[in-house]
Each structure stands twice: as C-alpha cells, then as structure tokens.
Amino acid sequence: MVDTVFENHPDAEVTFITHLPAEEPDRESLVGNNGKHMVLFPPFPQSQGFHCFHPKLILIRFQDRLRVVISSSNLMEEDWTRWSQCVWMQVAFVSLSHDQDFFSVSEGESKVAEKKLDLEFRTRLIQFLRQCSCPDDRVFNLLRGVCFKGVRVRLVTSVPNVYRKANMNEYGHLRLRTILRSLDEYRASRDIPAQYPPILSLCSSVGTPSANWLHSILASCHGGRAVPEKTALDALVHMVYPTEQCVKESAIGADMAGSLILHSKTYAAKSFPKKCLKRYKNVKGREGSLPHAKYCECSEGV
C-alpha cells in the first residue's frame, strides 16, 4: 500500500512512520522523489520493559483543511478488506486564513474554552508527532495555518517509556483518568449523580489481564473513582472476544488470524477473569469476519 500511495501522489509531501523489530533498534530513513517521500523508523526507547510502535494515525492536509483519521487498521490491504475494524475521523478543520476572528480579543466563556481545546489538541498532536521522529519541517507544513475550531475531543496518546510522578498522567489510561476526573468534578458541581456503568471492550489481543490491572483500567474509565465495594469484576467488565470455533469458521481461517492473541495457558490460569469474556458474534452482512477493532464504551445498557 505504501508504494501505491507514493505512485498516486508523486508531487505530494508524504511521510510514513512505521515500527522496527525490537532486535533492530535503529535504521536509516528511506527518502525518495527529491525528499518528498519519506519512510521513518522511530527507535525504541532505552528503558526497561517491552515496547512497540503501534499507533494508527493518518493526517491528510488539503489546501483549506486537515483530515485526522484514527483507525484500528494497519496499512495493509487485508486489514481494510478482511477484518472488522473501526475508524474515527474529524474533517474540515478550517484554515486560519478563513477564520481570523477565532483568535480575536473579544470572547465569551465558550470561546475561551474553544481556544483551550484548540491549543491542547494542537500541542498534543505536535508533541506526539515529534515523539514519533517526524521532522519538524514536516510537522510545520502539515499544521501551518490550521485552526482546530470546534474540536470536541481530547487527544490521548501512549508513548512507551518509564514515567514517574506527574509525568505518569501525560499518557495512556492515566491521562484518560485525568480528563474524566475533571468531567466528574464538573458534574458534581451541577449536582449530577455519579454513575458507575460497566465497560464493554472489544480488542484483538487480551494479554494477561490481572484483576488489579482491570481495576486500574476501570478506575481510569470512571475518572479515578474506586470500584464499588462488593461488586464482582465480571459485572463491571465485559470483554467481547471470538471463540476458537468462530475463528476456525471465519473467512480467513485460523492460520491467518495471528492478530487475535489469547494463549491457552493464560486462559487456563486461575487468575484469568473468564467470567468477563463475552462471545463475539457477527451481524448480518459481516458473516465470517473477525474483529481487529479496539473499542471501549461505558454504558448502562451492556
């Protein structure tokens, strides 16, 4: 797919950032078409633990807007044609040249809030692109003059490293916890009762989720509030996952389903939260497909 993009956009500035194997910590960037086309390989951080480069972020700059796309798909044809995925997209960010009054001095409370969201989104995006080893000139050309007016989302990134103290709240689910805590504080100021709905989660790799880790994720999804006492974990976490039979009967078959990772030893362990698993089922029109989506929802209707 990379070659196809380069071939169809010979005059565009195109940058791909992809991972390297852990045993190959560094590699020279690939540059072509007089510097317009680049493939970059960000190095692994020099810290303990296991790390990988795993974001799926697409930024497309038009003359008058920027399109931001976050998907669960890798840049591989089979990911877009043979797996069930999810895509979030924000389009038509207005160019600053068309909206100078957004940064005018006269503003009310709502406009101040808009500006804060604009600045935060822009800052987080630039910070993340730099952490992905994207050159500053590419970042500047991509975001020059773009005004994120009307953005209604907060950007949460995960950057592998070892963080301590306040830095722990800058990334991953602890940043999510910080954001949602401020929302809970707002609700409390408006006398809106606090709720603790269960989490519905769909993912391709389960790993080895301990009860402590799941409680930590639960707390983050609810702004840091502790799990209600005497509430069973399986009443609060629902992990949707395909069965072995579902994988065998899928369109791609078990041999091609390597993205679905749940080891039998992990499942057999006493500590594994088996009751939290819910059977994945296809809907009409998507028979035989397997999920690669990453989705999480807090909902009373689970």
Where are the language model's segments positioned?
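PLD/PLD-like phosphodiesterase catalytic module centered on the HKD motif
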Residues: 1-302
